């Protein structure tokens, strides 16, 4: 079953601010989450309901809602500051 991918407004803004090459790669990874929301590289974040995947030096933090087949992208950013405030 294919999941629907949605972005929080903050995540959409963060994606638009990334360099074009990185943005293209991240979009491909996010599109793949619709088919498999828990790929082999995905890691659950401790103390939250979120998961994350790595894309070069960037991270995509997202939530999977299995009951409604939804992948909600929460944040996208560089690894040095993506986890602040989660």
Regions from the PLM with identified roles:
Residues 29-54:
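A short, surface-exposed loop/turn module that caps and links secondary-structure elements
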Residues 1-5, 10-24, 40, 55, ...:
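Enriched for short, Lys/Arg-rich terminal
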């Amino acid at each position: 079953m294919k999941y629907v991918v949605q972005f929080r407004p903050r995540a959409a803004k963060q994606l638009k601010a990334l360099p074009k090459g990185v943005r293209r790669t991240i979009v491909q990874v996010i599109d793949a989450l619709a088919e498999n929301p828990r790929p082999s590289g995905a890691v659950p974040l401790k103390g939250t309901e979120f998961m994350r995947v790595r894309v070069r030096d960037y991270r995509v933090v997202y939530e999977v809602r299995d009951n409604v087949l939804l992948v909600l992208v929460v944040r996208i950013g560089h690894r040095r500051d993506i986890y602040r405030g989660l």
